[in-house]
């Protein structure tokens, strides 16, 4: 995380700034509220019909969650089913849905079975072709219904767009409540927020392991920045970078075996490679400036990072192997301040924070063309993080002096705001795709 415009833009001021990010704020509620702004072009009209048996589920109903998931992307136009209630393909009158303007139709059942379980069966239909596009069948416990709804939305999203859905993923972020800092993990829609660790000293830079089972982060609990890795299921953790001086900015290698970290153990802040258990220290960068905020390419061959070696904070790329004699290639040339790079999941570009005048905005740059696209028009954006399908970027911003989380589509057309009623939220990180157990 880097300074906002109201703070010093000098890289050397990073460590001091971190202590003053949340000086004054009110207690926050755990649940995130979502507001959606804008919509993508050529939205797909889809109808989600309330499932048979869903009326008995009450607040655990599936279709409201599915509809909300799809609507947040800006890619879908939800068609009101009106009084039409088919639950099986033989009950569907396709001309009626054509008249309603639906291109796709989701129908299904959610029926209680033995052991208090709920048997779910969903079909996605192509209205014009009168054919099945996909289906979802699962039996779950009542407390798993919301997760099942996200998986259904993932299926619908993938069948209609060709991209993998990310509704079943999780996000991590830091929330400040009074004098307490809490690293939390929540579902991608902001529900089911759970604290990972809490302290009265700052917690920053959460980073997900590629398999989603661990979080690396920086804690100031011992009055200095130390990098920890914590296993979410067991809540056990280990200090993996606690060298003399500053330890910060952890980034996982794609295979989960290594971490890139920023250390000042040899003087100025430089990027090092360590094993995920803290061993095997290896220096990656050697410059007269400050090198920080590393991000691995999806194939693990390169890192991009922020450095002021040229006189202003800019983004560079260099190979991971080859020793400190490797030459770093400068990537950003528009403006005097470009920071916080993160590779796109396909490796074809990266997101970062670009300063234009007094505004710090989320941007995307393409490796092949060098073209830069600004995605936001707010003033105090920071910490961008790609969704695992590359279609959205999660980031922190400020509204009326309070930190909130927002997400913007990679084309800039749709934005969603995730906020608590009060409080201050920062340091977002979008987790990887969740693997089926």
UniProtKB/Swiss-Prot annotation:
InterPro entries: 6-blade_b-propeller_TolB-like (IPR011042), PD40 (IPR011659), Tol-Pal_TolB (IPR014167), TolB_N (IPR007195)
Annotated compartments: Periplasm
Annotated spans, Disordered: 410-437
A Gene Ontology BP annotation from the UniProt entry: cell division
GO CC entries: periplasmic space
Transmembrane segments: none
Coiled coil region boundaries: none
The UniProt record lists the keyword Cell cycle: yes
Composition bias, Polar residues: 410-423
Alphabetical keyword list: Cell cycle, Cell division, Periplasm, Signal
Principal cellular location given in the protein's record: periplasm
UniProt keyword annotation of Cell cycle present: yes
Signal peptide: 1-30
Superkingdom of this protein's organism: Bacteria
Record's subunit section: The Tol-Pal system is composed of five core proteins: the inner membrane proteins TolA, TolQ and TolR, the periplasmic protein TolB and the outer membrane protein Pal. They form a network linking the inner and outer membranes and the peptidoglycan layer.
Entry's family note: Belongs to the TolB family.
Function in brief: Part of the Tol-Pal system, which plays a role in outer membrane invagination during cell division and is important for maintaining outer membrane integrity.
Name recorded for this polypeptide: Tol-Pal system protein TolB
Annotated organism of origin: Nitrosospira multiformis (strain ATCC 25196 / NCIMB 11849 / C 71)
Name of the encoding gene: tolB
């Amino acid at each position: 995380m880097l300074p906002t415009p109201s703070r010093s833009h000098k890289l050397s001021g990073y460590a001091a700034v971190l202590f003053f990010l949340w000086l004054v704020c009110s207690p926050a509620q755990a649940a995130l509220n979502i507001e959606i702004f804008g919509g993508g072009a050529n939205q797909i009209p889809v109808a989600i019909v309330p499932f048979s048996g869903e009326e008995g589920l009450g607040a655990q109903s599936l279709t409201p969650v599915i509809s909300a998931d799809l609507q947040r992307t800006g890619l879908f136009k939800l068609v009101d089913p009106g009084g039409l209630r088919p639950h099986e393909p033989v009950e569907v009158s396709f001309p009626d849905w054509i008249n309603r303007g639906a291109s796709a139709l989701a129908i299904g059942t959610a029926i209680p079975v033995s052991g208090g379980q709920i048997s779910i069966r969903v079909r996605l239909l192509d209205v014009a072709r009168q054919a099945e596009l996909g289906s979802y069948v699962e039996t779950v416990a009542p407390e798993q219904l919301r997760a099942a709804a996200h998986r259904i939305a993932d299926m619908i999203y993938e069948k209609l767009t060709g991209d993998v859905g990310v509704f079943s993923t999780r996000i991590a972020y830091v929330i400040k409540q009074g004098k307490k800092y809490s690293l939390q993990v929540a579902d991608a829609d902001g529900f089911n927020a759970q604290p990972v660790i809490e302290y009265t000293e700052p917690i920053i830079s959460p980073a997900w392991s590629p398999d989603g089972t661990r979080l690396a982060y920086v804690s100031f609990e011992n009055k200095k920045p130390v990098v920890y890795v914590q296993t979410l299921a067991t809540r056990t953790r280990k200090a993996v970078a606690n060298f003399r001086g500053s330890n910060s900015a952890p980034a996982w290698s794609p295979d989960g075996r290594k971490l890139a970290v920023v250390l000042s153990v040899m003087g100025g802040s430089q990027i090092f490679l360590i094993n995920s258990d803290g061993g095997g220290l290896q220096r990656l960068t050697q410059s007269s400036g400050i090198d920080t905020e590393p991000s691995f390419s999806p194939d693990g061959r390169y890192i991009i990072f922020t450095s002021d070696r040229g006189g202003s904070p800019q983004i560079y790329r260099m190979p991971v192997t080859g020793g400190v004699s490797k030459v770093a290639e400068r990537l950003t040339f528009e403006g005097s301040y470009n920071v916080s790079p993160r590779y796109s999941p396909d490796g074809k570009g990266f997101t970062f924070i670009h300063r234009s005048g007094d505004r710090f905005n989320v941007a995307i740059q393409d490796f092949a063309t060098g073209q830069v696209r600004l995605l936001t028009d707010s003033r105090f954006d920071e910490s961008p993080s790609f969704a695992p399908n590359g279609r959205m970027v999660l980031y922190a911003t400020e509204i009326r002096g309070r930190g909130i989380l927002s997400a913007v589509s990679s084309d800039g057309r749709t934005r969603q705001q995730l906020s608590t009623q009060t409080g201050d939220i920062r340091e977002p990180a979008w987790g990887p795709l969740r693997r089926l157990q």
